[in-house]
């Protein structure tokens, strides 16, 4: 059971996209990375080929390391920024559940 899962809302802690938040689209455990919607946008230039007669510029979300991400305890509003939190685990009724360390509530 991972601390960050698909469809979780996360915030970026460091780098060019610091402070941005988005939903996790995909996890890549081998690289310890995740693809987050709207974060770490890269552009790729494709050369013209037989299939594609004109070249094109493609934008896509590149993977970002999990160490640069934190789960969002409370979503951002106009007045307050998002509150990042660490994740802990607790066993209730013989089930392991994730707990937000800042709020103490189940995720």
Curated annotation (Swiss-Prot):
Q: Write out the entry's keywords from A to Z.
A: Ribonucleoprotein, Ribosomal protein, RNA-binding, rRNA-binding
InterPro entries named in the record? KOW (IPR005824), Rib_uL2_dom2 (IPR014722), Ribosomal_uL24 (IPR003256), Ribosomal_uL24_CS (IPR005825), Ribosomal_uL24_KOW (IPR041988), Translation_prot_SH3-like_sf (IPR008991)
Q: Which domain of life is it from?
A: Bacteria
Q: Which GO terms describe its biological process?
A: translation
Q: What's a Gene Ontology MF term here? A: rRNA binding
Per the database entry, which stretches of residues form a coiled coil? none
Q: Name one Pfam family in it.
A: ribosomal_L24
What GO cellular component is one of the record's annotations? ribonucleoprotein complex
Task: Summarize subunit and interaction data from the UniProt record for this chain.
Answer: Part of the 50S ribosomal subunit.
Record's function text: One of two assembly initiator proteins, it binds directly to the 5'-end of the 23S rRNA, where it nucleates assembly of the 50S subunit.
Q: Which family does it belong to?
A: Belongs to the universal ribosomal protein uL24 family.
NCBIfam families to which the protein is assigned, alphabetical: rplX_bact
Protein name as annotated: Large ribosomal subunit protein uL24
């Amino acid at each position: 059971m991972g601390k960050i899962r698909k469809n979780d809302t996360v915030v970026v802690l460091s780098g060019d996209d610091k402070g941005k938040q988005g939903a996790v689209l995909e996890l890549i455990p081998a690289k310890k990375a995740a693809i987050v919607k709207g974060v770490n946008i890269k552009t790729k230039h494709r050369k013209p080929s037989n299939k594609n007669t004109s070249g094109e510029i493609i934008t896509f979300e590149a993977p970002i390391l999990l160490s640069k991400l934190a789960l969002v305890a409370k979503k951002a509003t106009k007045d307050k920024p998002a509150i990042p939190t660490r994740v802990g685990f607790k066993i209730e009724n013989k089930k392991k559940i994730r707990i937000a360390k800042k709020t103490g509530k189940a995720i």
